[in-house]
Amino acid sequence: MMTRLTCDVVKALGDKTLSVAESCTGGMIGAAITSVPGSSKVFKGGVISYTNEVKSSLLGVSKDLLAREGAVSLPVAQEMAVGVRAATGSDYGLSVTGLAGPGGDEYGNSVGTVFVGYADENGFFARKFLFDGDRESVRLKAVNAALQMLMENL
């Protein structure tokens, strides 16, 4: 899964470190990063937080926030990025939460809705993306969007 973008991200990290928190991508970002030779110098690790329980217990995402906004939301993506950065002591935290299919959620999100979160020493933010395609296509597009967003902020 090594791509030009993934290689560029690893190179751009330099002496900084990255950790990821993934939901709908199920470890695909971590797999992409670790496919690059030398990535062990910059990649600390990842959490596949597929359930709300893991988002809360391992990443510190507020249970109230999860109940109020749903797992697929901008503030949850932000808290995931902040949480994985704090838990691992990384310079950067990157997160993805979304709906790859087959159906939407009770909060009005449709299939293809993905939020990518980013955190560093200066703060955090998240962006919403709407992707089309089947489950695998949405997941691949989410990985690419997350890596692109990271690259733009390195």
Q: How would you describe each model-predicted region?
A:
Residues M1-L154:
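Short alpha-helical segments enriched in small residues
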